[in-house]
């Protein structure tokens, strides 16, 4: 699942990072669970959470789920602390409630992130691969839309 971006450059002093990555690749961080969403029309990435520990690149897809907010199978998983990336590229999310395999989860600050154009809100969504109880790590597949 993991894909490597072309380069990573740390901007000293302000703890920000700039990365040249493919459009369908995001860099996820752990510690305070930082994620970066690649822009669609440019090779730069934009933050949707805060933190500083790099965990690796993973494939992702955008999905705007604002219209799905009231559906019971859409779960907003808050960060920090929700994103866990294993070295082999597997992704785990911390379940805030009991989950059933196939339920949808979202990654972002309060479940939300600024989109690529700076307008509106987007999520990176994932599908739970297994049943899980609240407080446990759930292996997920990033949703293809």
For the regions a language model picked out, list residue spans one by one.
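Surface-exposed, low-hydrophobicity beta-strand/loop segments enriched in small/polar/acidic residues
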Residues: 1-145
